[in-house]
Amino acid sequence: MKIAVGCDPNAEAYKQELITYMRGLGHEVTDFGSEDVIYAHVATKVGEEVAAGHFDRGVLFCGTGIGVMLAANKVKGVRAANVNNVYSAKRACLSNDCNIITLGSQVTGDMLAKELISAYLDCTYVYNERSGKKVDAINDYDNAR
């Protein structure tokens, strides 16, 4: 799977460890950097790349994961979720067809982050009657703006 990643400067070491982990799982990972202190810039860049179909998924990092989630969700076609437990990481994919997850380097330890990333990347969204209509409604709103 092709994965786009990025972070703010505070999460650089965290991101590097998790890039190594994702590559070890066999994923092709492209790093969009961490130099810009305005995390919205890297989050929207990753969002644009994922929404354009250049990458299968995205993973973003900042202190809490909330800021990069908010910024990425401003990009048309992005459905980003901040995840902090394995169930939510799986459901982000299975129920919500999220194409980006976000994690907080200051609130999620390295081992848990690896579990969350694996849970998310191991899932495939399959349209179904229950969740599909909800995702369609989100996409309809997104396409209307």
Summary of predicted features, one role per range:
Residues 1-2, 23, 46, 143-145:
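SAM-dependent methyltransferases
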Residues 2, 13, 30-32:
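Helix-termini ("caps") and immediately adjacent flexible loops/tails
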Residues 4-6, 10, 86-145:
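C-terminal binding/interaction regions
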Residues 4-25:
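Glycine-rich phosphate/diphosphate-binding loop of Rossmann-like nucleotide-binding domains
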Residues 28-39:
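A short beta-strand-loop structural module common to alpha/beta enzyme folds
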Residues 46-83:
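Helix-adjacent hinge/juxtasegments
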